[in-house]
Swiss-Prot record:
Head of neuraminidase: annotated span: 89-470
GO molecular function: exo-alpha-sialidase activity; metal ion binding
Native organism: Influenza A virus (strain A/Equine/Kentucky/1/1981)
Catalysed conversion reaction: Hydrolysis of alpha-(2->3)-, alpha-(2->6)-, alpha-(2->8)- glycosidic linkages of terminal sialic acid residues in oligosaccharides, glycoproteins, glycolipids, colominic acid and synthetic substrates
EC number, UniProt record: 3.2.1.18
Function recorded in the entry: Catalyzes the removal of terminal sialic acid residues from viral and cellular glycoconjugates. Cleaves off the terminal sialic acids on the glycosylated HA during virus budding to facilitate virus release. Additionally helps virus spread through the circulation by further removing sialic acids from the cell surface. These cleavages prevent self-aggregation and ensure the efficient spread of the progeny virus from cell to cell. Otherwise, infection would be limited to one round of replication.
Gene designation: NA
Cofactor: Ca(2+)
Protein name: Neuraminidase
Family, per entry: Belongs to the glycosyl hydrolase 34 family.
Length: 470
């Protein structure tokens, strides 16, 4: 075959292949169109992407096709049932770590809020950490002076438990410098207190919407729990204080359904002082362990029934659990009266276990450092000093702070009882550290069927930050 014949043969073969490719492409297009028409899907080739936004109560559904987006808004599915929460507390042999946010360590280089008063509360689907921000970030000039408790910049926000209080994952809840929050099985309810000291207002939000308010009745810093409120069969309960921190004040129990207040009652407690109660459900009632900021180094106990009747007194145990406090050996205990005459105090908690009690306290008797939880035999009902178990959570070389209680609902655990849990705040910055700010992180522990070794899950941030050196 001469060269010209070779060229003609190669050209003919190439032309044949080209024609075959064109035919195959045409057939492919025809088949694709026929299949799409038969399936009735039109030209929506891609799958559906669903995004949920924190600030809305709807779901955004985006259907993508080539360069065209079809956006459809649908109602967010809501839970159908209220949580029962009438189960007893589970017996705890020890407390295992549940989460630790390390917010201050992360905040040295991350966008983390300056906060105080963190607490945890759970829905049937998740637990969230709530906290009161100062409207500023760590390592920023606006963090200066955030040792102040009440300001117009403070807001209640939340993240999933274990996350740092960062700007990217936090959800706004309420304008507040004092707060509580809980889930009834259907929606979150928050109570946020804000405004001037002599005319503060508490706004009750339900499902993110303002539903009711409580005006200050004592005109002296209306305030609430700084920990989870308690919902039983759709009714939610919390405790508020209005009046002096260092003498007799006024105390009330509130009851709400779907965020609307349906009942309230004054607590008669002459000679006693109640603040910052840590409450939990137990056998159909609400049990609270509170703070006496007036005289007692023993903690007030409040038990609330669904009809808003109540019993009030003090933790009977012969071991004091407030700070500051005297020596254990010098304390006798009382079920009815404040003892110790130390004044001031710190938010704390306890759990009833039959007649026994698990009670948390700082290790230091005079400052908010270290933290331990102790089990006192018959300590709920008698002046017992029989300490049968102790677990250290933070050693006495490191700062602690507030602490409070919550429970894991049976919807989360699939148990027949409510798991007792607690959190411990670890305050850093002013007045103990050389900084311009005050903030905190937290460790969260939950009750288990086994003994857990003591350790120190302290904050661990290295201070001062760059902003403190300017």
């Amino acid at each position: 075959m001469n060269p010209n014949q070779k060229i003609i043969a190669i050209g003919s073969a190439s032309l044949g292949i080209l024609i075959l490719n064109v035919i195959l492409h045409v057939v492919s297009i025809i088949v694709t169109v026929l299949v799409l028409n038969n399936n009735g899907t039109g030209l929506n080739c891609n799958g559906t992407i669903i995004r949920e936004y924190n600030e809305t109560v709807r779901v955004e559904r985006i259907t993508q096709w080539y360069n065209t987006n079809t956006i459809e808004y649908i109602e967010r599915p809501s839970n159908e049932y209220y949580m029962n929460n009438t189960e007893p507390l589970c017996e705890a042999q020890g407390f295992a770590p549940f989460s630790k946010d390390n917010g201050i360590r992360i905040g040295s280089r991350g966008h983390v809020f300056v906060i105080r008063e963190p607490f945890v509360s759970c829905s049937p689907l998740e637990c969230r950490t709530f906290f009161l921000t100062q409207g500023s970030l760590l390592n920023d000039k606006h963090s200066n002076g955030t040792v102040k408790d009440r300001s117009p910049y403070r807001t209640l926000m939340s993240v999933k438990v274990g996350q740092s209080p960062n700007v990217y994952q936090a959800r706004f809840e309420s304008v507040a410098w004092s707060a509580t929050a809980c889930h009834d099985g259907k929606k979150w309810m928050t109570v946020g207190v804000t405004g001037p000291d002599n005319q503060a207002v508490a706004v009750v939000n339900y499902g993110g919407v303002p539903v009711d308010i409580i005006n200050s009745w004592g005109r002296d810093i209306l305030r609430t729990q700084e920990s989870s409120c308690t919902c039983i069969k759709g009714d939610c309960y919390w405790v508020m204080t209005d009046g002096p921190a260092n003498r007799q004040a006024k105390y009330r129990i509130f009851k709400a359904k779907d965020g609307r207040i349906i009942g309230q009652t004054d607590i008669s407690f002459n000679g006693g002082h109640i603040e910052e109660c840590s409450c939990y459900p137990n056998e159909g009632k609400v049990e609270c362990v509170c703070r006496d900021n007036w005289t007692g180094t023993n903690r007030p106990i409040l038990v609330i029934s669904p009809d808003l009747s109540y019993t009030v007194g003090y933790l009977c145990a012969g071991i004091p659990t407030d700070t500051p406090r005297g020596e254990d050996s010098q304390f006798t205990g009382s079920c009815t009266s404040p003892l110790g005459n130390k004044g001031y105090g710190v938010k704390g908690f306890g759990f009833r276990q039959g007649n026994d009690v698990w009670a948390g306290r700082t290790i230091s008797r005079t400052s908010r450092s270290g933290f331990e939880i102790i089990k006192i035999r018959n300590g709920w009902t008698q002046n017992s000093k029989d300490q049968i178990r102790k677990q250290v959570i933070i050693d006495n070389l490191n700062w602690s702070g507030y602490s409070g209680s919550f429970t894991l609902p049976v919807e989360l655990t699939k148990k027949g009882c409510l798991v007792p849990c607690f959190w411990v705040e670890m305050i850093r910055g002013k007045p103990e550290d050389t900084t311009i700010w005050t903030s905190s992180s937290s460790i969260v522990m939950c009750g288990v069927d086994h003994k857990i070794a003591s350790w120190s899950w302290h904050d661990g941030a290295i201070l001062p930050f760059d902003i403190d050196k300017i």
